[in-house]
Design a protein with these regions (language model features):
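Acidic donor-diphosphate engagement hotspot in glycosyltransferases and nucleotidyltransferases
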Residues: 47, 99-101, 184
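A conserved acidic beta->alpha catalytic loop
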Residues: 40-49
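Donor nucleotide-sugar binding loop of glycosyltransferases
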Residues: 15-18, 43, 71, 97
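Short, acidic, metal-binding catalytic loop of nucleotide-sugar glycosyltransferases
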Residues: 24-33
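Active-site acidic short loop of glycosyltransferases
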Residues: 3, 32, 82-85, 110, ...
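Acceptor/aglycone-binding surface of glycosyltransferases and processive sugar-polymer synthases
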Residues: 66-81, 86, 98-178, 205-215, ...
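Hydrophobic helical membrane-anchoring modules
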Residues: 1-6, 10-11, 17, 24, ...
Length: 245
C-alpha cells in the first residue's frame, strides 16, 4: 500500500453534494500529497451515487465502513485505517479552509503532534452559530486557555491534525460525538507533546443537517474539559494517560 504524506478523514452521512464541491477545492488548493478516507455509516449513503465522479479528482479516495453509527465511531475507524504520518479530520461541509491544509501539514513537519484549526485565534472567525452553542464552545475554549496549560484558544473544534505518533500511543476512550478531539488535545498536552494552532473560519452549515447534539454530548465534553484542567491544577503527569497496549 502506498504511504501518503497525509490522510484526510471525513466522516459522512449523505454528504454527496457537499463532497463534490469540497473535492474541487482540494484539487485547487492542496499541494501536499494526500488521500481522503470517507467514513460512512450505511450502505444506502448517497456517496455511493457519486462514486464515478469521485474518480475524476487528482487524489485517491477510499471508502471506510463505520462498524457502528455516528461521527465518533466513524472518525476512530478512519484514524485506525490510515497509514500516513499524520491525519487531518475535516468536515464534509467546510468550504472555507481547504487552503490551510498545507499550513497545518507544515506545522506537523515542524514538530507539532496536534495542529488546531482555531476559530478563536487572531485571524479566525465563527459566524452563524446558534447562540447557546456559541456561548458553550467559546466559554469552554477560553477558560481552558486561561486556566490550564493547553496552549491553544480553540479546544472544541473537531477540525484538526493529529500525528501518527500520538494516535499510535493514546487510547481514544470517547464514544459519542466529536469529544475524541478534546480528549486527544487534553491527553497530548498531558504527555507534553507539541500543540500549535492556525487561524480558521467557521460558518453554520447551509446544506444538509448538522449532527452536533449539544445536550446529549455535553457530559462527555465535560469529562475531557475537567481532564484538561486537572493536568494543571492537580499536577497530573504523562503517567496518568491511558495508552494503547
Amino acid at each position: 500500500m502506498k504511504k501518503n504524506s497525509l490522510e484526510i478523514v471525513i466522516p459522512i452521512y449523505n454528504e454527496g453534494n457537499n463532497l463534490i464541491k469540497l473535492f474541487k477545492l482540494f484539487d485547487t488548493n492542496v499541494k501536499t500529497d494526500f488521500r481522503v478516507l470517507l467514513c460512512y455509516d450505511k450502505q444506502d449513503d448517497n456517496v455511493f451515487d457519486i462514486l464515478e465522479v469521485l474518480k475524476n479528482f487528482k487524489f485517491e479516495v477510499v471508502l471506510v465502513k463505520n462498524p457502528l453509527n455516528g461521527p465518533c465511531s466513524a472518525v476512530k475507524e478512519g484514524l485506525n485505517f490510515g497509514n500516513s504520518d499524520c491525519v487531518i479530520v475535516y468536515p464534509a461541509d467546510d468550504f472555507l479552509n481547504s487552503d490551510i491544509i498545507d499550513k497545518m501539514y507544515k506545522n506537523f513537519l515542524e514538530g507539532s503532534d496536534i495542529v488546531v484549526a482555531s476559530r478563536f485565534t487572531e485571524g479566525g472567525s465563527m459566524k452563524g452559530c446558534p447562540i447557546l452553542k456559541s456561548i458553550l464552545v467559546r466559554a469552554a475554549s477560553s477558560s481552558l486557555f486561561l486556566l490550564s496549560s493547553i496552549p491553544v484558544r480553540d479546544a472544541s473544534n473537531g477540525f484538526r491534525l493529529f500525528s501518527r505518533r500520538l494516535l499510535e500511543k493514546v487510547e481514544i476512550e470517547s464514544k459519542i460525538g466529536f469529544a475524541y478531539s478534546l480528549e486527544l488535545l487534553s491527553k497530548c498536552n498531558r504527555l507534553r507533546y507539541k500543540i500549535s494552532e492556525i487561524p480558521a473560519q467557521w460558518e453554520e452549515r447551509s446544506e444538509g443537517s448538522s449532527r452536533f447534539k449539544i445536550f446529549s454530548w455535553l457530559p462527555e465534553y465535560l469529562k475531557w474539559y475537567l481532564y484538561g484542567l486537572s493536568t494543571t491544577w492537580l499536577k497530573r503527569g504523562p503517567d496518568r494517560v491511558k495508552i494503547k497496549n
